[in-house]
């Protein structure tokens, strides 16, 4: 399993995107298992942090292909054998008060490579003790703090962010674009 976790900022609610690539090392299609609270069997399990809202997917809808039980979301499509046979793109917002946010994100499967990209804004401080910092990198004109972890078993990743945009704050990146400065 590979996972990419991408976070951007809106005043009062960071937006998160997660991209997962799954495979099935068996020789038969996995059709799922019974999950309490669902009528259909669940095949793949994803977790969203406490308080996540506006949950969407690229290839399916919550309440249809994807079913939510608590903070766990299950895919209901069978998983065929092979490497990287399923990709899931999940998006959500995480509302918060003030300018800091603590997130606990569960990864229920072994992960070969996790990449966390957090859009960098002036004054943003990130503490991710389980991850290795890759510094700040420019990707398509946007600066991101890069964090990584390789080869880990199922676990919870804790992330603490301070210096986020408060609910009624102006986004400094928008001000820089308006001023003609594309360096942020």
Spans of model-derived segments:
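Lumenal/extracellular ectodomains and adaptor appendage modules
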Residues: 1-184
